Amino acid sequence: MPVRVANIWKHHRSEGEIRVYVGRACRGYPQSPLGNPYRASEGGRDQALTQYRAWLTEALQDARSPAAAEVIRLARLVAGGADLVLLCWCAPKDCHGDIVAEAVEKLAARMGPGGTVPA
């Protein structure tokens, strides 16, 4: 099942889905290790997403980084058949959540039995 990205204000929970907030600390939500450190208001959405993709790619090189640990955790859920929804404020606009979903799906597809992470 593909990972979905939804707007935190507009998404209605479906039975059995796992919802994970992936944004910055805001409006009572804690900072996610996958929150985008680059703001669209400071250089435009495209630039923020380009910078985020590079940031996440680098973070995933160190399995001990908080971002990598969270992607691994989410990939294990997806590999196990979970219906995962990533929540952010900007969806359905282009969103860093789409980049996270791509990374999670890619890793989940490569995982072995029991959620083992490939070398």
What is each stretch, according to the model?
Residues 1-119:
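Catalytic phosphate/metal-binding cores of nucleic-acid and nucleotide-processing enzymes, i.e., regions
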